[in-house]
Amino acid sequence: MADQLTEEQIAEFKEAFSLFDKDGDGTITTKELGTVMRSLGQNPTEAELQDMINEVDADGDGTIDFPEFLTMMARKMKDTDSEEEIREAFRVFDKDGDGFISAAELRHVMTNLGEKLTDEEVDEMIREADIDGDGQVNYEEFVTMMTSK
């Protein structure tokens, strides 16, 4: 399944993996998974975190390594994000609930994920998704960005 991914996708997933793998040891633990989920405003229980890991933990060692992470991401991409998942993700970014993701909101979420971005990088991300050119990302633009891969 993971063999259907492009090199660019694999590189993106490697970057995502390293956001989760806080100590850089090549595996994601329940603790690391919990940290990232909480930084995104989720509040999973220990049992939920364990379930999430068990779902993809092919070798049964209780952690997720990069190949397992790739398999999980490939699976997720196949049942392309449901409308509800995309709406949920949009809400994570749209902090003030006004229906738009501003540069400040994008920066806030990325900083919570441990990604320090320059103003230029944040503006560039907004520009890429901002179809109508109003300087922010509305829900339709967000959906377009999330589903056009």
Curated annotation (Swiss-Prot):
SUPFAM superfamilies: EF-hand. The keyword 4Fe-4S does not apply. Ca(2+) 1 binds at D21, D23, D25, T27, E32. GO terms for molecular function: calcium ion binding. Ca(2+) 4 binds at D130, D132, D134, Q136, E141. Residues 8-43, 44-79, 81-116, 117-149 form the EF-hand domain. Keywords: Acetylation, Calcium, Metal-binding, Repeat. One of its GO terms (cellular component) is myosin II complex. Calmodulin mediates the control of a large number of enzymes, ion channels and other proteins by Ca(2+). Among the enzymes to be stimulated by the calmodulin-Ca(2+) complex are a number of protein kinases and phosphatases. This protein has four functional calcium-binding sites. This is Calmodulin. It comes from Patinopecten sp.
